[in-house]
Amino acid sequence: MFNYSGLNEECGVFGIWNHPEAAQLTYMGLHSLQHRGQEGAGIVVSDQNELKGERGLGLLTEAIKDDQMERLKGYQHAIGHVRYATSGNKGIENIQPFLYHFYDMSVGICHNGNLINAKSLRQNLEKQGAIFHSSSDTEVIMHLIRRSKAPTFEEALKESLRKVKGGFTFAILTKDALYGAVDPNAIRPLVVGKMKDGTYILASETCAIDVLGAEFVQDIHAGEYVVINDKGITVKSYTHHTTTAISAMEYIYFARPDSTIAGKNVHAVRKASGKKLAQESPVNADMVIGVPNSSLSAASGYAEEIGLPYEMGLVKNQYVARTFIQPTQELREQGVRVKLSAVKDIVDGKNIILVDDSIVRGTTIRRIVKMLKDSGANKVHVRIASPEFMFPSFYGIDVSTTAELISASKSPEEIKDYIGADSLAYLSVDGLIESIGLDYDAPYSGLCVESFTGDYPAGLYDYEANYKAHLSHRQKQYISKNKHFFDSEGNLNV
């Protein structure tokens, strides 16, 4: 999606165990995950004696410079992180991995997602005397681990993971092991890879494994954690109260098209969603164009299904930072003009089908429609390769209030008029589920579609009161007419 006024991804995590150039490979892995966050990056390394780290603000190349990388050489194990702030402010103190030095051990930790009970946990911990050095929810898990009475670090980790709620993955490093963990719904992805020399890798996406020439080993599934050390790799469960609900937005927008999630290639899923969208909402036109970059696969599928030319009517400046993930509305809107331009010779006098992957606030797609018409387009029919984004997300996407969502208060017809399109149609929820093609024995075939349905598989917890207080009339109507599988604590409704 190129909706600069829209969604923001959470983060990307990476880990590697037992390689003489651990920091350098981590840097490469993080580079392939840069699309998941641009506000900051960090790397923590370890050997059998110590842990040390470097971090900074900005893109990876800005955050960790050559002199910092020099200081990380010579260590065999590492974790790394690229950040977009979904909780906590945007200062250096919130850049991960966090590194803790205790009297008996040192620990590095980084996190992708959002802990929806972090506020209440933090309040309880502070009442017990805990001191926090950041506003990030990631720090909560470390306090829980250290306050555990469990006899080993692994047992303390398991106990702590059972206390936190939300959509998350963790990568944790000690001098003895590399740990990874996934929430009880597997909302956020985590995969394991293995290099030819036996080195194990953890990553948010398979693209970070592929870039190092490693082989995919397995997904870490709902409620599982992995331990990687000199003895090898072990995958265990920390809870059996699991219901798979993989974030549909990973497929729709966040993941790279060359990544594979739960056995489904992201590009193939997006193309299938475009085909399904064409079946559900065809329209007469001269051509199909996609909004660069993540909508291009869906646009090609739409064009192929409907039998129209697929043209490059919009050009993206590849050398500007991914402004969509910029933290302020003003920067996102300025980014539209800097990053995107219409190809006048292609669109002039034509009836266009414009495919995008979602509409969140609506301001960016409105600018794009105007840009195309200013360049001579006769008609612009907007087709969205996902359902209406009607409900906030609390699991690691930075759209956590109803006020941010145009579909929460406006009908498709009203949105069509607002954005200046000649027609507007969305992919149905059933069409999305079919396009992705998961077959888990779970609601929505194992997808988390909370932003389209208001059905929250991990519950609401700290967000519940505010969420319910601000439900719009349109949201309430949708909820009353559609079955919900989960209650406010993420339990399956019987």
UniProtKB/Swiss-Prot annotation:
Free-text cofactor note: Binds 1 Mg(2+) ion per subunit.
Domain Glutamine amidotransferase type-2: 11-231
Any one Pfam family match given in the protein's UniProt record, by short name: GATase_7
GO biological process, one term: purine nucleobase biosynthetic process
Name under which the protein is recorded: Amidophosphoribosyltransferase
Cofactor(s) listed in the protein's UniProt record: Mg(2+)
InterPro entries registered for this protein in UniProt: GATase_2_dom (IPR017932), Ntn_hydrolases_N (IPR029055), PRibTrfase_dom (IPR000836), PRTase-like (IPR029057), PurF (IPR005854), PurF_N (IPR035584)
HAMAP family: PurF (MF_01931)
Stored PROSITE patterns: GATASE_TYPE_2, PUR_PYR_PR_TRANSFER
Residue ranges listed under propeptide: 1-10
Pathway involvement of the protein, from the record: Purine metabolism; IMP biosynthesis via de novo pathway; N(1)-(5-phospho-D-ribosyl)glycinamide from 5-phospho-alpha-D-ribose 1-diphosphate: step 1/2
Family: In the C-terminal section; belongs to the purine/pyrimidine phosphoribosyltransferase family.
Keywords from the named record: Glutamine amidotransferase, Glycosyltransferase, Magnesium, Metal-binding, Purine biosynthesis, Transferase
Reaction(s) the record says it catalyses: 5-phospho-beta-D-ribosylamine + L-glutamate + diphosphate = 5-phospho-alpha-D-ribose 1-diphosphate + L-glutamine + H2O
Catalytic residues in the record: C11
Record organism: Staphylococcus aureus (strain COL)
Organism phylogeny: Bacteria, Bacillati, Bacillota, Bacilli, Bacillales
UniProt binding sites for Mg(2+): S294, D356, D357
Gene3D superfamilies in UniProt: 3.40.50.2020, Glutamine Phosphoribosylpyrophosphate, subunit 1, domain 1 (3.60.20.10)
EC id: 2.4.2.14
One of the record's GO molecular function terms: magnesium ion binding
Function statement: Catalyzes the formation of phosphoribosylamine from phosphoribosylpyrophosphate (PRPP) and glutamine.
